[in-house]
Amino acid sequence: MVQQLSLFGSIGDDGYDLLISTLTTISGNPPLLYNSLCTVWKPNPSYDVENVNSRNQLVEPNRIKLSKEVPFSYLIDETMMDKPLNFRILKSFTNDKIPLNYAMTRNILHNTVPQVTNFNSTNEDQNNSKHTEDTVNESRNSDDIIDVDMDASPAPSNESCSPWSLQISDIPAAGNNRSVSMQTIAETIILSSAGKNSSVSSLMNGLGYVFEFQYLTIGVKFFMKHGLILELQKIWQIEEAGNSQITSGGFLLKAYINVSRGTDIDRINYTETALMNLKKELQGYIELSVPDRQSMDSRVAHGNILI
């Protein structure tokens, strides 16, 4: 369990390249491309559960978020085949269109490998050409983040994905004078589940939870001093009726630091200072602010929100 201190901001699509250069200069580190498929689960409404704890205190039921990385081969189409998988590829995701669909995510949840065709059409000559070009670029600019590359798996499979991460979060701390958002988060890793035809879906159903909604995040991360992490991301809500990009026309920026102990006041104050220094450094370019705490409330009584 950690205390996560954070600030949020946004930029338009046209400011992406400049922000990448700025954050690279500030952090001294290259951006790392990542993705995360997030599924949100709520208590099964057909179960009658007493919402009280061992002290007979009323406890509101919370949602649980499960997230994992999926192979990038599930996320790119034919128009991106010849592009290296680095931070530049994010500029190609400008609309709602994305190969990952509702049926594929259902297969992932039920531990079935989704059927993808985009990488099957890639020939070996194209791969060799791309790697040769990347090698030349890397040798020419060994310290330049522009040439940082990350290859997707040529043979996508569900088994190659990272394990599921299970997260439960509290509503951020209240207070009108807070300079940063502070939220308690408990997280663990699901390495495996037992039983016949086991899957994360059957595991959650066994715990008394049912699927509610899901979304996909694709972005880049910067690792900075003082344990500060910056995420620049695009978000899609994935529904049976189709996908929709929530961040259409721009990017969401999240700056956060995790503090391992909520009672470590000195560390919390130090972390808050680090975030405020970043806010001051980016002032006039990006306005980092504290979001509405209701938008980060995972309690079931507060509607379908992204957490």
Swiss-Prot record:
Keywords: Activator, Nucleus, Transcription, Transcription regulation. Disulfide bonds: none annotated. GO terms for cellular component: core mediator complex; mediator complex; nucleus. Its main location: nucleus. GO terms for biological process: cellular response to heat; positive regulation of transcription by RNA polymerase II; positive regulation of transcription elongation by RNA polymerase II; positive regulation of transcription initiation by RNA polymerase II; RNA polymerase II preinitiation complex assembly; termination of RNA polymerase II transcription; transcription open complex formation at RNA polymerase II promoter. One of its GO terms (molecular function) is transcription coregulator activity. Residues 117-126 have a biased composition (Polar residues). The keyword Cytoplasm does not apply. It is found in: Nucleus. Residues 117-162 are annotated as: Disordered. The keyword Oxidoreductase does not apply. Component of the Mediator complex, which is composed of at least 21 subunits that form three structurally distinct submodules. The Mediator head module contains MED6, MED8, MED11, SRB4/MED17, SRB5/MED18, ROX3/MED19, SRB2/MED20 and SRB6/MED22, the middle module contains MED1, MED4, NUT1/MED5, MED7, CSE2/MED9, NUT2/MED10, SRB7/MED21 and SOH1/MED31, and the tail module contains MED2, PGD1/MED3, RGR1/MED14, GAL11/MED15 and SIN4/MED16. The head and the middle modules interact directly with RNA polymerase II, whereas the elongated tail module interacts with gene-specific regulatory proteins. Belongs to the Mediator complex subunit 18 family. PANTHER family: MEDIATOR OF RNA POLYMERASE II TRANSCRIPTION SUBUNIT 18, MEDIATOR OF RNA POLYMERASE II TRANSCRIPTION, SUBUNIT 18. Component of the Mediator complex, a coactivator involved in the regulated transcription of nearly all RNA polymerase II-dependent genes. Mediator functions as a bridge to convey information from gene-specific regulatory proteins to the basal RNA polymerase II transcription machinery. The Mediator complex, having a compact conformation in its free form, is recruited to promoters by direct interactions with regulatory proteins and serves for the assembly of a functional preinitiation complex with RNA polymerase II and the general transcription factors. Present with 1011 molecules/cell in log phase SD medium. This is Mediator of RNA polymerase II transcription subunit 18. It comes from Saccharomyces cerevisiae (strain ATCC 204508 / S288c).
